[in-house]
Swiss-Prot record:
Molecular functions per Gene Ontology: 4 iron, 4 sulfur cluster binding; electron transfer activity; metal ion binding
Any one annotated GO CC term: cytoplasm
Binding site for [4Fe-4S] cluster 1: C8, C11, C14, C47
InterPro entries: 4Fe4S_Fe-S-bd, 4Fe4S_Fe_S_CS, 7Fe_ferredoxin, PSI_iron-sulfur_center
Protein name stated in the entry: Ferredoxin
Length: 55
């Protein structure tokens, strides 16, 4: 599954890109539900600050 690092600026660009709605908003950053993530990489490809990594 992909994960969102501390580099996240909480811009929200990734959330609508996720085909399985695995991304949600938390206090400071977005979070990815690893149980829902299908490893498609759509979120990582759209992140403007490269804060989403595989693993």
């Amino acid at each position: 599954a992909y994960k969102i690092t501390d580099g996240c600026i909480n811009c929200g660009a990734c959330e609508p890109e996720c085909p399985v709605e695995a991304i949600s908003e938390s206090d400071a950053v977005r979070v990815i539900d690893a149980d829902k993530c299908i490893d498609c990489g759509a979120c990582a490809n759209t992140c403007p600050v490269d804060a989403i990594v595989e693993g």
